[in-house]
Amino acid sequence: MVGILPLCCSGCVPSLCCSSYVPSVAPTAAHSVRVPHSAGHCGQRVLACSLPQVFLKPWIFVEHFSSWLSLELFSFLRYLGTLLCACGHRLREGLLLPCLLGVGSWLLFNNWTGGSWFSLHLQQVSLSQGSHVAAFLPEAIGPGVPVPVSGESTSAQQSHAGWQLSAEADACPSVLYSEVLEWNKNINTYTSFHDFCLILGIFLFCFVLAVIGLPYIKPGLSLSVALLWQSLILLSSLVQQDSQVHTWGCLFSTFTST
């Protein structure tokens, strides 16, 4: 950037007028003008000593920066778009597209199969938990049977048994009800999490399939690689259903613990 020459009055010494304030300015760089000598004039002009104009006025700085930003940013975006288009053409022509298609279909298929199997497992456990609660609650709140205790009379045994059953009737239903509520909350959390994963898998699959595109796949080797990849994914998913349930269980426990 071009600096502005310091403007000093005719009666000033350039070394005192400019270089005393800005040490990097050489005394010969000052330009003397036919202006009467005054200390106020030198004090006003001292900031102009070889300082770039863009740093002296904020609006000039903003103007320069905005023009630079518009030029550089648009050129960068244009270059980035050209690069992405070239990468897209290269991607469509190469063997990376079948891999992306395979990953998208694997996400979709794995979310659907693993999630459905684990949902069925959760429903079975929930039914067993509900039957356990239904079988246990009448015991807690129903009429109690006296439990004989050695060293106590019959009335003391009956009163002791009645106190024990009343304490269970007060405590057990609330504890079991809170456990059932917690279990239902976990199931609802997992269901929403599974729905989110399923929607994400569908979106990725459709994006890879439609945007990057099956119409651009070359016939022959790329299509055969895609079909081979798909068959391997389906085979591994069908063989490893138990491991998928275990994996979904670990993910579910990790997600609910956080």
Curated annotation (Swiss-Prot):
Its main location: membrane. Residues 1-19 form the signal peptide. Keywords: Membrane, Signal, Transmembrane, Transmembrane helix. GO terms for cellular component: membrane. It is found in: Membrane. The chain crosses the membrane at residues 94-114, 197-217, 219-239. It is a multi-pass membrane protein. This is Uncharacterized protein KRT10-AS1. It comes from Homo sapiens (Human).
